[in-house]
């Protein structure tokens, strides 16, 4: 079992990307957690490049801010250059409300509407890097697309990305963002139940799950390709990231990683 990893320079704390609940655990706030909270405003689809407004103005120096974010990720232990380059390429400020664009490159979760958040950059980088370490995945499934940011990062180096979002409003939001960045043909976005996966598209070289179940759904394990990896939070009050690799037709290798705090994985869809 690997020892839990905490990003250098950050005190140990729960982390909680995911979707469903709006409650915050003790000590977790919108600034230090990915727990999705009730937002003050609703996020809007990304404006086209060069558009006005605060998000468009931030674009003038967003390259510098993204570079600083990537340098911070390096100090926090992210070493996969594919992931770092992808994070540097995707304009995170276009995935949040214009009123929050100035905070887009902080290592913080930010509200995107529908009582949900965009996951903090370190969590996105950590999960993608773990799922793709020492391999070149060509088909990846994301469960819990949110505003589309993580799918956009994956699409920078993965040929075929499939992303499922159970909340209709977020599905529409993510679709608008991906279209604005001309990534709609690189990411197949589905409004559906992520716990079921996409059996008609499987197998997947990697699966990234953005909410915690008491156990990893067997349907998702079955949809991993041989040698494929799934990363997800698991547990109720005491949660950990788990990395699962398929080693045979009916065998999987499990490795526990960091202690985390995610909201529950939920079945079904929300219109």
From Swiss-Prot:
<dbReference type="InterPro" id="IPR029063">
    <property type="entry name" value="SAM-dependent_MTases_sf"/>
</dbReference>
<comment type="function">
    <text>Catalyzes the methyl esterification of L-isoaspartyl residues in peptides and proteins that result from spontaneous decomposition of normal L-aspartyl and L-asparaginyl residues. It plays a role in the repair and/or degradation of damaged proteins.</text>
</comment>
<dbReference type="GO" id="GO:0004719">
    <property type="term" value="F:protein-L-isoaspartate (D-aspartate) O-methyltransferase activity"/>
</dbReference>
<feature type="active site">
    <location>
        <position position="119"/>
    </location>
</feature>
<keyword id="KW-0963">Cytoplasm</keyword>
<dbReference type="GO" id="GO:0032259">
    <property type="term" value="P:methylation"/>
</dbReference>
<dbReference type="GO" id="GO:0030091">
    <property type="term" value="P:protein repair"/>
</dbReference>
<dbReference type="InterPro" id="IPR000682">
    <property type="entry name" value="PCMT"/>
</dbReference>
<feature type="region of interest" description="Disordered">
    <location>
        <begin position="1"/>
        <end position="60"/>
    </location>
</feature>
<keyword id="KW-0949">S-adenosyl-L-methionine</keyword>
<keyword id="KW-0489">Methyltransferase</keyword>
<feature type="compositionally biased region" description="Low complexity">
    <location>
        <begin position="39"/>
        <end position="49"/>
    </location>
</feature>
<dbReference type="GO" id="GO:0036211">
    <property type="term" value="P:protein modification process"/>
</dbReference>
<comment type="similarity">
    <text>Belongs to the methyltransferase superfamily. L-isoaspartyl/D-aspartyl protein methyltransferase family.</text>
</comment>
<keyword id="KW-0808">Transferase</keyword>
<dbReference type="Pfam" id="PF01135">
    <property type="entry name" value="PCMT"/>
</dbReference>
<protein>
    <recommendedName>
        <fullName>Protein-L-isoaspartate O-methyltransferase</fullName>
        <ecNumber>2.1.1.77</ecNumber>
    </recommendedName>
</protein>
<dbReference type="GO" id="GO:0005737">
    <property type="term" value="C:cytoplasm"/>
</dbReference>
<feature type="compositionally biased region" description="Pro residues">
    <location>
        <begin position="1"/>
        <end position="15"/>
    </location>
</feature>
